[in-house]
Design a protein with these regions (language model features):
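Histidine-/acidic-rich catalytic cores in large beta-rich domains
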Residues: 3-18, 25, 31-67, 86-87, ...
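Extended, solvent-exposed segments with strong compositional bias
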Residues: 68-69, 79
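Short, solvent-exposed loop/linker segments at beta-strand-coil boundaries, enriched for Pro/Gly
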Residues: 71-73
Length: 294
C-alpha cells in the first residue's frame, strides 16, 4: 500500500526466549552464590514488578524469598523446595520503589537485596479506594483485568500495586492447577477486543503456551478437570459475534468440540437493553457443571 509503513515485531514468546537464554548463559558461565546472586529485573519483559534471582549452593537446600512490605502486613514470602541450583521468581514488588528482598536458606545464611522498580503508573494512583483489612486479605492480592489498553494489575490490602502486565492482555485471568494462569493474548485480530486466543503464563510473565483460535477469544475461559480448556469465541466469517464456545486440547491446541448457540437458541428472544442483531447473545462467562455434564 502506497505510503504505508510496515514494521516487523518479533512475537513476545520469541523475545522472552531470547531474554531467558541470555540470562541462563550468563548464569551458567558465572559463579553466582547466595551472597552474590544474579538478579534479573523484569526478565520476561512484561512484568516490571517481578524479578528472577539465580544462584548455586553447595548442598541441596530449601530457600525462602521474602519481599518486605512498606508495612509489616504487606510482606510477601514463599519457600521453594530443596535444590543446589536455584532460579527463583521474585513477585510482589512495589511500583516506583526500592524494594527490600531477602533470600534465606532453610536454617542457614541469608542475604538482603535491593530491587528498584519503575513507576508503572506514571505518578497516578490507579486505586481510588480499597475497603478491606490485612487480616482478611493477608498476603493475597485482588486482580483487576481490563478489556482495552489499561494495565492488568493486582493490588494488596493497602491498595498498592504488587503485580502487573504492561502488554495489553485482556479479560478474565484464571488460576490453573499447575500454578500458571490463563489469560487472553495481547494480539488483537478484530475490534473492539477479539484477541488471537489465550496465553498460559507464569505470574512472572513467561508465556508457556499460546492457544490460537480461528474466531479469536473474548471474555472468559476455564480449565476442565482433565486439563482441557473451554473458551468463548465466535465465527468471524458470519454476521454474529460472541455466540460460540470451543473445547481446546490442552497439549496440542486442537479444537475438540465447538458449540454454536444459534443451533439451539433463537436470536431475538429475551432481548437485553443493548441487544443487536450482530451481538444478539453477548456471552460474558462460561462455567462447567460436573453434576449435569453441561
Amino acid at each position: 500500500m502506497a505510503g504505508a509503513e510496515y514494521r516487523f515485531e518479533k512475537h513476545l514468546i520469541v523475545q522472552q526466549a531470547e531474554a531467558e537464554r541470555a540470562m541462563l548463559n550468563t548464569f551458567h558461565q558465572g559463579e553466582y552464590t547466595l551472597e552474590h546472586p544474579l538478579v534479573c529485573h523484569n526478565l520476561y519483559l512484561i512484568n516490571p514488578l517481578s524479578a528472577v534471582v539465580a544462584f548455586r549452593t553447595e548442598e541441596a537446600v530449601a530457600v525462602t524469598v521474602t519481599v518486605f512490605g512498606k508495612a509489616k502486613q504487606g510482606t510477601i514470602s514463599h519457600t521453594f523446595p530443596r535444590a543446589k541450583e536455584h532460579i527463583l521468581p521474585v513477585l510482589g514488588l512495589y511500583s516506583g520503589y526500592k524494594n527490600q528482598v531477602e533470600i534465606r536458606e532453610y536454617r542457614g545464611r541469608s542475604v538482603r537485596l535491593e530491587i528498584e522498580t519503575p513507576d508503572v503508573f506514571d505518578g497516578k494512583n490507579p486505586v481510588y479506594s480499597m475497603d478491606t483489612t490485612p487480616e482478611y486479605l493477608q498476603d493475597q492480592c485482588i486482580f483487576l483485568s481490563p478489556s482495552a489498553n489499561e494495565v492488568f494489575a493486582a493490588f494488596d490490602y493497602a491498595g498498592d500495586a504488587r503485580w502487573c502486565l504492561t502488554t495489553p492482555c485482556v479479560f478474565d485471568l484464571k488460576r490453573l492447577k499447575n500454578g500458571n494462569v490463563l489469560i487472553g493474548t495481547n494480539r488483537l485480530i478484530r475490534m473492539p477486543y477479539y484477541m488471537s486466543g489465550l496465553y498460559e503464563i507464569s505470574l512472572c510473565g513467561k508465556i508457556y503456551r499460546e492457544y490460537r483460535l480461528p474466531g479469536g477469544s473474548h471474555h472468559d475461559a476455564i480449565e476442565q478437570k482433565d486439563g482441557n480448556i473451554l473458551c468463548l469465541t465466535q465465527d468471524l466469517t458470519t454476521e454474529t459475534v460472541e455466540d460460540m464456545c470451543v473445547l481446546i486440547d490442552r497439549e496440542t491446541g486442537e479444537i475438540l468440540k465447538s458449540w454454536d448457540y444459534k443451533t439451539f437458541l433463537q436470536p431475538g428472544l429475551g432481548k437485553s437493553g443493548s441487544w443487536s442483531e450482530r451481538d444478539w447473545f453477548h456471552n460474558n462467562a462460561v462455567w462447567y457443571d460436573e453434576n449435569t455434564d453441561s
